[in-house]
Amino acid sequence: MHNYLDFEKPISDLEGKILELKKLASEDESVNTSDEIARLEGRVRDAMVEIYSKLSPWQKTQVARHPSRPHFLDYASRLFTEFTPLAGDRNFANDDAIQAGLARFHGTPVAVIGQEKGNDTKSRIKHNFGSPRPEGYRKATRIMEMADRFGLPLITLVDTAGAYPGVNAEERGQAEAIARSTEMCLNVKVPIVTVVIGEGGSGGAIAIATGNRVYMLEHAIYSVISPEGAASILWRDSTRAKEAASNMKITAEDLKSLGVIDGIIPEPVGGAHRDPDAVISRTETVIGDALKELSARNGDELRADRRQKYLNIGRNL
């Protein structure tokens, strides 16, 4: 059973009718519903194409947050072999919101970092809903240092609403941890390929997203603040999030036009959650092509390119 978003009601109604017909056919073999099911499935496809071809920024935000959308661990299990997670920041604790470790991508040793939101209540609590604490960013910094030391390409997958804003996180130096992670991301002399697979929220995202090549999934979002947060600041009213989203330039199309990202990875009609294997396969191709291109550059070129790309974000807006 799909978790339908509010704008997907036409799809929900049609798929509900299909389920009813399938149930009827299973209960009475004399009833032939195949033609009607085929007709309704065609209408579902048409409805999805029509709806998803003109999503508003707020609707894309909803898709990026869809509970069934594939997250970091879904990508890791399909993109990499021999993925070995590493834990702890060697200072305070381990943070499961940041998943990081060593793996092979198409046989090549790589370092991998990403945010994991979880897919049910238990795992979401374990991963703190994808909002990293300071120790998570310090773990990311440690993995970046390791990648630089051993000359391993770095792949980062971004999916967070933002860094955890709790009092304890602030007491343990959240701002400093994000800044150090961003600095390390800019300074390493290995190729970095970043993909925003869901939400890219604020400094919590950019701390692992200053790559040589940055891509977004078609319905991902990337912003300095959530639409709800922006609405709360601008109008003291979080219910105006839809209005805020429309003015924030948070979609992949907007950010590509502004030069913030390098490319957009198409999603299956209906969003990544409708066909995770397809979108992960497309992501694999994009990462592979980017690493192949970047492998021809030396470390100094990679670092200079990445730093200039980061500085250009504010200049080009």
Swiss-Prot record:
GO terms for molecular function: acetyl-CoA carboxylase activity; ATP binding; carboxyl- or carbamoyltransferase activity. Transmembrane segments: none annotated. SUPFAM superfamilies: ClpP/crotonase (SSF52096). One of its GO terms (cellular component) is acetyl-CoA carboxylase complex. It is found in: Cytoplasm. Its EC number is 2.1.3.15. Acetyl-CoA carboxylase is a heterohexamer composed of biotin carboxyl carrier protein (AccB), biotin carboxylase (AccC) and two subunits each of ACCase subunit alpha (AccA) and ACCase subunit beta (AccD). This is Acetyl-coenzyme A carboxylase carboxyl transferase subunit alpha.
